[in-house]
């Protein structure tokens, strides 16, 4: 079915959904309230009137109870409310200061007395700890937590670690080095879908979030790690819904400043690579300041809010002592080693919002947020020198206009128009050859520059909710039009030399760098010798995303709630379908098809966006005793992800008039260096340099072919949860939750033209490439490899979450989580993207099934705020995790596969290559080594000085990594045979700036009114 027919179907579906009076839904950026009205004998009261009033804006809504005494409000703004209930012949009851949180359904029951005497039910001003209708696995981060807990980078996503099962992961892309990267289900963070006021904030180029908001502008957010409702989609990982602050009838705001300096930091314990450490305290200075203000423009009608933050950071990263020593040996080759690499960063964030209340039934708001920053050397990880530096510029925007309409007391509509823009540039000031060595030591022009990503989206959403008796029907349509998405990515822009030995080992050889064969097999960073040339642009125009959902929240009995949902998601041109026919690899395979069944199977059809994205979801919650303090729940659902643009990117580049391609990628001993006639085994530094071909309109001999597999489909997870909630009292709750996630159709890149034994029983006869003869017969260039983007990856996650939460007990708020989990899969690395199997012929080999890179069996999280005497607050966050795995690898691939397979394939002890092909033995089990446990404690001590009833000055000191623990995590060297094998190479998550490497102190002040 072509895109026009799909668009027609989408429009027709929208009309059907919007015209139906029995199917309605709610947006994700709201809260709900429900309850039952009874008399003193517990008999239900029908037609009782319930009125809810927002205490900040004065906005009111009124409804009546049904014949079972039940009432419900949907599409409510999160905030503090008062609720009044009255019935014919009964008194009026009022609940004051009821807090409603995003994505939660609060329950407020009333028991009315006969007669006209009014009474007041006092309710604390915090959110109810138990959502009696909750069937998913979600956590709310409250306004108090955002304000009171320490934030190392003022990225509110750092608080998502308070959700059970969420762990920190390394940055998976150069554009995400300053983001809190969340590992959910053992994945690397790309599968997180973030919305702001219900509007898409997703990076469709590399996955994960795009924009960071001013922390002062965020009211609260909810993270759903598994089993979220049909309202949310486009994520096989977690869904995060963020809402911004609004103005109110009273002026309120803040002003703050935070200061850091090198003098407040402890020495970092830098890993030397041999099990010992050196100390270093690199230069550091940061100032972060800003504020917010909100209030009425016209009381009860028009409100405004504005927040601004500015960051000035003059920082640096300490070089690994091992890397510094090795790079100091090759200054004659152009290396510029330095004990520290400067990493300055400057940023502005702002948010503005206008809210207008037309009347009690209609309101609207406009929210606009922008972020702009520039930085230097943000890709440095402690193993690079100064020549491998870069600069980065970012400009981001997200906005929404939302209209809320109460059409009847039981029928609510919410319409949203959204906009998102992102422009990222990463480049360097020079171009020199890149030299790489084992363990990640490098110098020269960064292989990731230059690159540019641009994304422009327009979103149209309509969500409707209708309550009929015991049912609340929800439906909606979510349509995103992306007129432009793409940019350019010139990977491997200069000649790259990947040495199979460290500089110290090379210089110990009689001929030093003049020794032939030092590039054979390459290393874990590269293939040996390579370069790419051509037009690096990749552009997708008029991509679209359509989401439709229907859900029934059925209050089956007063004690049981059932959620029945169905969602449909469809992407249009997200896998580069419009470029496939022009892609030169596809065209070469078409030419070779008459001579090769393999080639014919690859072009028999073109890859298309998946069209069967139906995801059923069902959940139930049951109140065991009818008192709301013992709840059991369970559910099942399917969740489709997006295909982000980095997957088809290389294929799209090969559809340009002048294509961008790896001109050559030499790995094997017999590979000939172009233009020299010298095999790689005989080439050495000082030999004639290769001839670099000019950009071509066709693929060249030895280049890398890129293909989207004809059977490619969207990744999907099947998720199950079962849980129990025990409300110990009104201020304390315990929860236990088991979750199971099966991930299918994950991205895996397979070289279909890898070296294959002529006779597996006698590999001394040599190897051949399955497609080379067909290419020759077709008269087209013989490619070095054909790398097929498939959806053959699989992984599994099982976890048991135990959680204890306490609010206001002895002036303490506490969150304590423990997770016992196991994340396994087929060679699941930390990037969750373009995973190469170690043997392309056996992508699902038993020895390739093992722990995921982010597998952490035990994880403990504690967060608290204690209000001490004399206006002092103490707020710690503690995270501890067991050791994560890392992989044992060979110094060069022990299988004669050529390029296009996982680097450093290591045979099992005692196994030979011939034994492997005889299937007498196999490869070493994947990720079978473990690094070091993780421990981090951050804390804030604050002194509150009251300056009147509504004004407060808070003076504070924050400490990050309070115990000065060196967290190396699984950043260990797995290269067998090197002196550094089994020792840490650096800190966990080396390219991320969100985890403190040593004790870091910060002074600050915040004035609020």
Where in this protein do the model-derived segments appear?
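Periplasmic N-terminal accessory/gating domains of Gram-negative outer-membrane beta-barrel systems
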Residues: 66, 90-246, 265, 271-278, ...
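Transmembrane beta-barrel wall of Gram-negative outer-membrane proteins
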Residues: 252, 282-325, 329-374, 391-419, ...
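Extracytoplasmic gating/loop element in the C-terminal half of outer-membrane beta-barrel translocons
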Residues: 689-697, 871-950, 954, 989, ...
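C-terminal beta-signal and terminal closure region of outer-membrane beta-barrel proteins
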Residues: 967-1009
């Amino acid at each position: 079915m072509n895109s026009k027919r799909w668009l027609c179907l989408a429009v027709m579906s929208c009309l059907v959904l919007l015209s139906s009076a029995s199917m309605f839904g709610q947006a994700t950026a709201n809260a709900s309230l429900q309850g039952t009205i009874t008399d003193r004998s517990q008999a239900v009261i029908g037609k009782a009137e319930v009125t809810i009033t927002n205490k900040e804006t004065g906005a009111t809504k009124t409804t009546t109870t049904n014949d079972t005494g039940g009432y419900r409000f949907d599409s409510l703004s999160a905030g503090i409310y008062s609720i009044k209930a009255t019935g014919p012949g009964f008194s009026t009851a009022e609940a004051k200061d009821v807090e409603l949180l995003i994505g939660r359904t609060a329950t407020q029951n009333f028991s009315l007395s006969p007669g006209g005497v009014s009474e007041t039910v006092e309710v604390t001003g915090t959110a109810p700890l138990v959502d009696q209708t909750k069937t998913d696995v979600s956590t709310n981060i409250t306004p108090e937590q955002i304000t009171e807990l320490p934030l190392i980078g003022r990225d509110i996503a750092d608080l998502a670690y308070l959700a059970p099962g969420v762990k920190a992961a390394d940055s998976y892309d150069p554009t995400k080095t300053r983001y809190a990267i969340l590992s959910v289900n053992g994945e690397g963070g790309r599968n997180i879908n973030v919305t702001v006021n219900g509007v898409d904030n997703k990076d469709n180029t590399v996955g994960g979030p795009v924009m960071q908001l001013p922390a002062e502008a965020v009211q609260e957010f909810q993270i759903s790690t598994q089993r979220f409702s049909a309202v949310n989609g486009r994520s096989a990982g977690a869904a995060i819904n963020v809402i911004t602050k609004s103005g109110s009838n009273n002026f309120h705001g803040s002003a703050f400043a935070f200061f850091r300096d090198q003098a407040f930091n402890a020495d970092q314990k830098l890993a030397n690579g041999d099990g010992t450490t050196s100390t270093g305290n690199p230069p550091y200075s940061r100032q972060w300041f800003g504020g917010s203000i909100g209030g009425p423009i016209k009381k009860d009608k028009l409100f405004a809010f504005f927040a601004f933050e500015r960051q000035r950071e003059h920082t640096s990263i300490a070089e690994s002592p091992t890397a510094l020593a090795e790079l100091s040996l090759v200054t004659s080759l152009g290396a510029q080693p330095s004990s520290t690499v400067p990493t300055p960063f400057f940023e502005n964030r702002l948010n503005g919002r206008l809210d207008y209340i037309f009347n009690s039934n209609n309101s609207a708001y406009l929210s606009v947020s922008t972020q702009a920053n520039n930085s230097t050397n943000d890709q440095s990880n402690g193993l690079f020198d100064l020549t491998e530096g870069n600069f980065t510029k970012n400009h981001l925007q997200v906005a929404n206009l939302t209209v809320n309409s109460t059409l009847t007391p039981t029928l609510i509509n919410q319409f949203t128009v959204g906009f998102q823009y992102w422009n990222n540039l990463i480049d360097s000031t020079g171009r020199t050859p890149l030299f790489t060595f084992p363990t990640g030591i490098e110098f020269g022009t960064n292989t990731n520059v230059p690159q540019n990503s641009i994304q422009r989206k327009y979103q149209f959403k309509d969500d409707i909710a209708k309550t009929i008796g015991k049912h609340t029907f929800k439906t909606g349509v979510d349509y995103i039009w992306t007129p432009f998405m793409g940019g350019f990515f010139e990977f491997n822009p200069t000649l790259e030399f990947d040495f199979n030995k460290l500089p110290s080992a090379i210089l110990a050889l009689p001929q030093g760098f003049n020794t032939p064969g030092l590039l054979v097999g390459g290393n874990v960073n590269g293939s040996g010798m390579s370069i790419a040339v051509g037009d690096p642009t990749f552009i997708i125009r008029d991509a679209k995303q359509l989401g439709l959902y229907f859900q029934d929240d059925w209050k089956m009995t007063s004690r049981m709630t059932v959620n029945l949902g169905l969602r449909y998601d469809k992407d249009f041109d997200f896998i580069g379908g419009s470029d496939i026919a022009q892609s030169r690899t596809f065209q070469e395979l078409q030419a070779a098809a008459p001579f090769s069944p393999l080639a014919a199977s690859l072009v028999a059809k073109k890859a298309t966006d998946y069209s069967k994205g139906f995801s059923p979801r069902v959940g139930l919650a049951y109140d065991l005793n009818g008192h709301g303090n013992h709840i059991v729940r369970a559910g099942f659902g399917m969740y489709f992800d997006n295909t982000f643009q980095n997957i088809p990117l290389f294929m799209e580049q090969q559809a340009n008039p002048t294509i961008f391609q790896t001109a050559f990628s030499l790995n094997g001993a017999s590979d000939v260096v172009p233009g020299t006639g010298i095999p790689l085994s005989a080439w050495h530094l000082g030999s004639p340099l290769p001839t670099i071909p000019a950009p071509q309109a066709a693929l060249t001999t030895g280049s890398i072919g890129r293909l989207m597999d004809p059977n490619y489909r969207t990744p999907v997870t099947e998720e199950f949860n079962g849980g129990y909630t025990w409300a110990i009292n009104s201020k304390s709750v315990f929860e236990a939750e088991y979750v199971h996630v099966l991930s299918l159709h994950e991205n895996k890149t397979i070289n279909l033209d890898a070296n294959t034994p002529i006779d597996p029983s006698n590999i001394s006869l040599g190897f051949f490439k399955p497609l080379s003869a067909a290419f020759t017969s077709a008269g087209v260039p013989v490619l070095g490899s054909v790398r097929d983007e498939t959806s053959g990856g699989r992984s599994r996650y099982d976890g048991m979450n135990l959680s204890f939460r306490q609010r206001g007990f002895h002036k303490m708020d506490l969150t304590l989580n423990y997770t016992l989990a196991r994340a396994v899969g087929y060679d699941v690395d930390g990037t969750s993207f373009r995973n190469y199997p170690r043997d392309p012929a056996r992508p699902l080999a038993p020895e390739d099934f093992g722990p995921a890179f982010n597998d952490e069996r035990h994880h403990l999280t504690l967060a608290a705020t204690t209000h001490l005497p004399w206006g002092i607050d103490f707020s710690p966050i503690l995270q501890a995790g067991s050791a994560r795995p890392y992989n044992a690898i060979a110094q060069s691939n022990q299988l004669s596969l050529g390029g296009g397979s996982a680097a450093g394939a290591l045979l099992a002890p005692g196994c030979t290559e011939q034994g492997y092909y005889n299937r007498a033995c196999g490869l070493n089990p994947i990720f079978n080594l473990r690094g070091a446990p993780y421990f981090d404690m951050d804390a804030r001590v604050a002194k509150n000085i009251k300056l009147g009833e509504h004004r407060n000055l808070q003076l504070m000191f924050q400490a990050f990594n309070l115990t000065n623990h060196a967290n190396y995590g699984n950043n260990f060297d797995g290269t067998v045979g090197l002196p550094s094998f089994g020792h840490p190479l650096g800190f966990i998550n080396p390219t991320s700036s969100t985890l403190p490497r040593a004790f870091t102190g910060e002074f600050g002040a915040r004035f609020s009114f």
